A protein has these predicted regions:
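Local sequence-structure signature of Cys/Sec-based thiol-disulfide redox active-site neighborhoods
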Residues: 1-30
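Short alpha-helical
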Residues: 13, 36-39, 52, 65
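Thiol-based oxidoreductase modules, predominantly thioredoxin-like and allied folds used
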Residues: 29-41
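Structural micro-motif
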Residues: 49-58, 68
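Non-catalytic, surface beta->alpha helical segment in thiol-disulfide oxidoreductase systems
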Residues: 59-84
Length: 84
């Protein structure tokens, strides 16, 4: 079973788009909202090689990046291979 983790924040259009994409595919995900869980921000920076923008998306412990990165792997057909 795949595991998707999305680091988000309040009032973030790209975060909402990423979550809506996974919902539309019936893919469960764990969301860490840094406004509600500030300690998760430092964790995210550490495991994403210093990225501070949101969202940050991980699939099966693989760092995907932000929403534009997610769109890129979808458009190139890599998403289906990664999510399996």
């Amino acid at each position: 079973m795949n595991k998707v983790i999305i680091y988000t924040k309040d009032i973030c259009g790209y975060c909402d788009r990423a979550k809506n994409f996974f919902k539309s595919k019936n893919i469960n995900y764990t969301e860490y909202n840094i406004n509600k869980e500030p300690k998760k921000f430092n964790e995210m920076i550490k495991i994403s090689n210093g990225m501070k923008t949101l969202p940050q998306i991980f699939i099966n412990k693989m760092h995907i990046g932000g929403y534009d990165d997610l769109k890129s792997i979808i458009n190139t057909g890599k998403f289906d291979k990664i999510i399996k």
